[in-house]
């Protein structure tokens, strides 16, 4: 009886060893899944159809994990797969990596990692630590936040994430922390209703590195989120770096808000995007902007061109300190900003600071100057706020100037008053064609008019003048 008991104890003690973690030797070996079955002492197995990873697996520095086309699925049983070397997945067919019930991955100081045509589902998160991993045509579905805050957590690296799809993940799809510097390239991806039950955007980035953060050609849609999620946020709240951002050709719709840029030393170019129907916020004081620029000082910069901003609770909100360029006389903004608002009031642009904003050459959905003025909240509503210069705007440039050498208007633009120098009958009309002044002049005449665009006619000559 004692002999039987001893044998049973020895046998039971041996079972955990079959699934103990395995680490590659770091001698430059390239491993396929089938080769791992032969060398990992039961950590990796094959059941004639699919591969299974039963315990933690580490690919050491100098070694390579290569995923080939010889199978379709890998089931990972609550294990951590760590890549310290390289991982290559250049598949013609899609390979699924599925949690059974969950898994996590960690790339740390990894090099030459190229992942294509993978389908990750039911994971607990993928961490990239100083590892410039390339993801191309990869799907990330049903990730939890058990291992990290996002489906992909980035720390001090510049990965390329292109042609990828993120669906119904519990946390953000892609995130980086406030205490690191990372500049991912996020290109032509689709983000569909990520984040469940938290005030977090689908793309949630901290400070950038020396490289530019690229967010280009993506669809960020929050339509089916159980609790409405934000679109994109890029923030440097501690003044860590000097972040450069290109936000271009994205469609950002049906989120709690569209794009948030917040903190110190952020410099963005925002061009060719669509910020549409980002109104899923019960309290407008807590969000709902198509674009929100919240600066700690005027080193929070944004050049905003050729965007469509409509259907949001607020079109553009500008808060505290910033340097925002929405269009100048020399370089018109050409943004379409209209039909944004809440509580029965239209708010296409809200300047909640002492900073002035140039917003020349935009389409506000109307050519009625007073209507545009009513849709912009700034110094004319509260003398303590900055001034928004929005004239001329799209629709104002239909008036042609003629024979401008016959008389002189100066300064132009003018601040409250200007002079007309010439001889003859002078007629001044506003942008609606209404006559505001008629007078015979001989020499220099001083004119004071309210803010707006005016047409000065003297005989057969015509000139436009802007009063701001």
Residue spans for each PLM region:
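Short, Lys/Arg-enriched, disordered terminal segments
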Residues: 1-4, 376-377, 468
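Bacterial Sec-dependent N-terminal signal peptides
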Residues: 1-24, 400-402, 459
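Terminal non-domain segments
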Residues: 2-7, 167-170, 253-255, 265, ...
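Generic detector of N-terminal low-structure segments
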Residues: 13-16, 109, 409, 420
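Extracellular beta-rich repeat passengers
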Residues: 21-396
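Low-complexity, Pro/Thr/Ser/Gly/Ala-rich linker/spacer regions in secreted
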Residues: 392-406
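C-terminal outer-membrane/trafficking sorting elements
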Residues: 403-410, 414-468
């Amino acid at each position: 009886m004692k002999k039987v008991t001893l044998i049973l104890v020895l046998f039971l003690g041996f079972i955990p060893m079959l699934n103990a973690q395995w680490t590659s030797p770091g001698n430059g070996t390239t491993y396929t899944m089938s080769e791992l079955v032969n060398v990992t002492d039961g950590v990796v197995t094959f059941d004639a159809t699919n591969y299974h990873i039963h315990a933690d697996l580490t690919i050491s520095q100098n070694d390579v994990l290569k995923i080939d086309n010889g199978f379709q699925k890998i089931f990972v049983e609550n294990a951590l797969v760590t890549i310290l070397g390289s991982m290559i997945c250049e598949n013609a067919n899609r390979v699924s990596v599925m949690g059974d019930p969950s898994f996590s991955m960690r790339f740390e100081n990894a090099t030459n990692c190229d992942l294509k045509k993978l389908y990750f589902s039911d994971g607990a998160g993928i961490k990239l630590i100083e590892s410039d991993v390339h993801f191309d045509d990869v799907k990330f579905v049903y990730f939890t936040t058990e291992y990290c805050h996002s489906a992909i957590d980035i720390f001090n690296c510049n990965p390329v994430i292109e042609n990828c799809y993120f669906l119904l993940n519990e946390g953000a799809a892609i995130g980086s922390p406030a205490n690191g510097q990372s500049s991912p390239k996020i290109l032509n991806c689709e983000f569909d209703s990520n984040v469940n039950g938290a005030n977090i955007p689908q793309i949630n980035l901290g400070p950038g590195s020396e490289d530019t953060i690229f967010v280009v050609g993506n669809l960020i849609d929050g339509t089916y989120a159980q609790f409405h999620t934000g679109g994109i946020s890029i923030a440097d709240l501690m003044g860590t770096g000097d972040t450069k951002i290109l936000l271009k050709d994205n469609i950002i719709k049906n989120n709690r808000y569209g794009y948030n840029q917040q903190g110190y030393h952020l410099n963005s170019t925002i061009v060719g995007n669509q910020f549409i129907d980002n109104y899923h916020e019960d309290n407008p004081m807590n969000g709902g902007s198509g674009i929100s620029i919240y600066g700690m000082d005027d080193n929070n910069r944004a050049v905003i061109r050729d965007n469509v901003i409509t259907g949001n609770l607020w079109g553009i909100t500008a808060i505290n300190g910033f340097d925002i360029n929405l269009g100048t006389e020399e370089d018109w903004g050409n943004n379409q900003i209209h039909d944004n608002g809440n509580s029965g009031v239209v708010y296409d642009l809200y300047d909640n600071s002492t900073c002035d904003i140039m917003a020349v050459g935009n389409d506000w959905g109307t050519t009625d100057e007073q209507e545009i003025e009513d849709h912009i909240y700034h110094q004319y509503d509260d003398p303590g706020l900055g001034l928004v210069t929005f004239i001329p705007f799209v629709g104002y440039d239909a008036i042609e100037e003629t024979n401008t050498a016959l008389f002189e208007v100066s300064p132009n633009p003018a601040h409250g008053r200007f002079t007309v120098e010439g001889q003859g009958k002078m007629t001044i009309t506003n942008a609606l064609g209404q006559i505001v002044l008629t007078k015979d002049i001989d020499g220099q005449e001083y004119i004071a008019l309210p803010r707006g665009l005016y047409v000065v006619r003297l005989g057969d000559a015509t000139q436009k003048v802007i009063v701001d």
